[in-house]
Amino acid sequence: MRVAGAAKLVVAVAVFLLTFYVISQVFEIKMDASLGNLFARSALDTAARSTKPPRYKCGISKACPEKHFAFKMASGAANVVGPKICLEDNVLMSGVKNNVGRGINVALANGKTGEVLDTKYFDMWGGDVAPFIEFLKAIQDGTIVLMGTYDDGATKLNDEARRLIADLGSTSITNLGFRDNWVFCGGKGIKTKSPFEQHIKNNKDTNKYEGWPEVVEMEGCIPQKQD
């Protein structure tokens, strides 16, 4: 009886050890697989992050050099979507900010710091050009000036207003007509014509929208004003 009991004990211990061994092996395999999957996912995530294109200020296509301000802007779309003006990753004017309107939309910024100074819009269809002229005359030297049209920005413009905008570096302002789309970035005290300007004429044969041309967009890097 004692021999039989001892034999049963030996068998029970052997079964226990075998079961423990099998379970430990299976668990180790699963652990290895889990760790392998974890490392694989980590490697894939790292690769995805490394291949993701970088984002630059205002969403422009490439980084600006030192001592330059990044900007991006778009004219309005017909009389439905307002213009958008972004400077140094700060949206200065947009429909979402509810500070745009029919006519010419203007944002002013400090040419040394990029700090926004003012944002306004002037109705050039049903409004008066006189306040716009006074606004243009009051702009201080060294100020960055960004402008974009919405709906119609030309009907009420007179020669004086156009001349003042031309003095900011605009070339196309003399030809801006009814419902043209136009974006411009210049500055008070600029000595040459600005390279930052886009203009598309209102033409019934080529208009993207009924009665309005397509949106014009522009981005670039504005040199910081030096002392």
UniProtKB/Swiss-Prot annotation:
The gene is FAM3C. GO terms for cellular component: extracellular exosome; extracellular region; extracellular space; Golgi apparatus; platelet dense granule lumen. Up-regulation and/or mislocalization in breast cancer and liver carcinoma cells is strongly correlated with metastasis formation and survival. Present in most secretory epithelia (at protein level). This is Protein FAM3C. PANTHER family: UNCHARACTERIZED FAM3. Residues 67-225 form the GG-type lectin domain. It is found in: Secreted; Cytoplasmic vesicle. Pfam families: ILEI (PF15711). Belongs to the FAM3 family.
